Amino acid sequence: MVARTLGVALSAEFRHNAHWIELMKKIIRILGWSAVALVGAGAVSTIALRRGEPINALWLVVAATCCYALGYRFYSKFIATKILVLDGLRATPAERLENGRDFLVTNKWVVFGHHFAAIAGPGPLVGPVLAAQFGYLPGTMWVLAGAVFAGCVQDFVILLFSVRRDGKSLTEMAKDEIGRIGGFVAYAAVISILIILLAVAALIVVNALKASSWGLFTIAMTIPIALLMGVYLRRIRPGKVLEVSALGFVMVLAAIWGGQYVSQNAGLASVFTLSAPALAILITVYGFAASALPVWLLLAPRDYLSTFVKLGTIGLLGIGIVVLHPTLQMPALTRFVDGTGPVFAGKIFPFAFITIACGAISGFHSLISSGTTPKLIARETETRMVGYGAMMAESAVAIMAIVAACVMQPGIYFAINSPAGIVGQAPAAAAATISGWGFPVTAGEMQALAHAVGEQTLFNRTGGAPAFAVGMAHIFSHSLGGETLMALWYHFAIMFEALFILTILDAGTRVARFMVQDALGHLYEPLGRTSWYPSILGTSALMVGAWGYFLWQGVKDPLGGINSLWPLFGISNQLLATVALCVATTIIIKTHRAKYAAVTLAPLAWLLAVTFTASWHKMFDPNPRVGFLAQAQALAAAPVTGATSRLIFNNRLDAAVTGVLLIMVTLVLVESVRQWIGILRGAREARVKESPFVRTRFAEERG
């Protein structure tokens, strides 16, 4: 009896202690997250309110870290539990439809790496660098807020909705959930937008590599390296992933190191020093080869190689920023907030938002979130980490790009990014113009910097990529090796950027080719077969020719091409995000969770305001530096030459493309709103086309 009484007492005491332990853990969690919130609020306040004196880049790092941590812990969890209702017991298409080729149950960290490598393109590197002409403040605030409340949300919900529909694409989901008309228009819009995105990605690579023998040699060598890796893994040593990884890594380092000797040899340097038009031709040939060749031969090994380079370099850059903790030289806001900026014309609203694009929200991501990634997810609960988390990682890259651009002296930043048509062709004239804006720089300073990084000149290197490379080389050389290695770090950065972007170029061309083949297959069945080479070659040529035309337009533009094509890129990208959010909102309303629809409706409303305003300005603004039609009219009033007549046609074409995209997205929006109103009024049946529930065989692993 005594023993029983003692046991009951001990049991009660144990429960009492366990209760207090849990309570203490809860209090510690609350205090910990409160501290994160307070530190984050302090960092954001410092960034937003500090005026008249430079701030340390660590404030941006701290603000970003806190915002991402809070967003992932609380906002993504709210979405996962209240809106999407993630179910760890539900089998994913990777499990149900596993075929070892397209559908394959894959480790969540491998899926995360694949997804990040696939979505991380030119946007987070280039957009924030270009937008830095407004100062560091606008870009930083939009990257943080846009990623947490818009970009990560879009990627997460589209990924989960695709997983629940057997990995269907965005356009297929649009057809199923919005209707046939909305689906058809969405398909046409996606193809059109993809062409613009690929053209601009190619233009950035061209601008980064033109007149750079070191950079071009390094990138050119990655093609035979990728081919060798593909053959080695497929034919020579099948399955030896670690061997081929080590081999590829060593060869890439050798290519970077060897590039400096190529640049110092007059004969070899002349071979690898090419003009922008020549590079444009070569990159279109590469795009065709990457789309038409077997995926194991070039695309897969290059993507595999670039994934290691991307993740490793981003990690090193983050460490470099923390170690160096540089001061931002760019002011919070510059004089160019009035829309007269030399990098691109236009006021902060809406142009800062469409310029930053992918660093905050990217429509292109919705194609990946409804493409290969949902076919690899092992469990629904992993979509939160992959969808929301990978976009946070890309947003962190955008913050690093802002730091890289803003640690330079503003005069150097504008000398690199301003086109010759704005500041002048001669170095002395360009330096005088930029100094006249209040950002001192001399031709001698620029020549010394060019010599330090192993380039002939850094004036008028538009496109954002060269400026990012200079900033990145500055951070690395001052924190990881000394200034004597600045040239090596600069060309490593160029190689990193080109690999970063070429991954999007070759994968995007292949995705577009698949979409075109799928459409043509309805007209003639063999054209839809992805294994039939006449169809492969024909559709690859069609897609490469389409984006190659816009690339050619950009390289022949006397204002650097980026002035006209990057706004078109930003508008197209954000319009694609608008389509994705229309689909997401429709599904949320159909699943009887309309009270939570603001999670996607709020970013949708913001994107509509931004993209429609930007589109209107790009078409009809009377300022020739802003409006396509105004520039065409101004050129037509001057003496017409072959070059000006081509520019007139291109500007009118850009205006027409913008208008057509706007109309198509408007139609998708109208069809979506009709669905929403009908469902909320009870006039339409709220039926979603999800795959039936099947219990996963991994149920015992639920946690």
Tell where the protein language model's regions lie, with residue ranges.
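Membrane-interface helix-loop-helix modules in multi-pass membrane proteins
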Residues: 45-50, 56, 102-165, 176-180, ...
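Transmembrane helix-loop junctions in multi-pass membrane proteins
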Residues: 41-54, 125, 137, 195-211, ...
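Membrane-interface loop-to-helix entry segments
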Residues: 58-65, 70, 76-79, 83, ...
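Extracellular/periplasmic helix-exit of transmembrane alpha-helices
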Residues: 321-337, 392-470, 507, 552-557
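Flexible loop linkers connecting adjacent transmembrane helices
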Residues: 76-104, 130, 144, 153-182, ...
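Loop-to-transmembrane helix boundary motifs in multi-pass membrane proteins
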Residues: 177-195, 387-396, 462-464, 483-493, ...
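Extracellular loop-to-transmembrane helix junctions
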Residues: 54-73, 131-161, 171, 214-226, ...
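Membrane-interface "cap" regions at the ends of multi-pass membrane proteins
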Residues: 16-37, 70-124, 307, 346-347, ...
